[in-house]
Amino acid sequence: SCLNFNFYNVVISPGSRNVPLAIGFASNNNFKCYSIVDERSAAFFALGLSQRSKEPTILVCTSGSALLNYYPAIAEAYYSEIPLIILSADRPTYKLNIGDGQTINQNNVFEKNILYSKSLKQDCTHSTEEIIKSNKQEIIDGKSTASSILSKQKSIQNDNELIIEEAFNNCINNNKPIHLNIPME
């Protein structure tokens, strides 16, 4: 989706939960990736890239409190009308609110300083056993067949593609930051 919208600059704050996103961007030569360990510095660096290029920069971080370090740059982008795309990795629903360290509610975390914020739906073909066991997500149950799980995944993928398209269009058309929260195993 990012390439379809001609988004090429990606600033990655390394972490464990966002490894699939980092690998996805870094392994594609169409993206210009920057790895900056300190989240606050990474966010302001991304802000500068977008300010210079007048194009959205993708900003990627891991789950939990790391995301909050982006907040000052996001607020600056919001009030200065600078487009940023924040992609945060998150724990799946069944791993939230169980007392794990560095876990926060990432939904709408930038509420008053973000144009658009949504959480994508959880992939149901990865870690199916864990999803069934906890079933807090109510995505699939123990009686689901392989065929019904694949059908459900197609529906999830379609919904996520619509959310992404809406988010990216909002970012482009309004020159404001958007946030997509991505649940990952």
Where are these regions (language model features)?
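N-terminal alpha/beta PP-like core and its mobile active-site loop of ThDP/TPP-dependent enzymes
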Residues: S1-E185
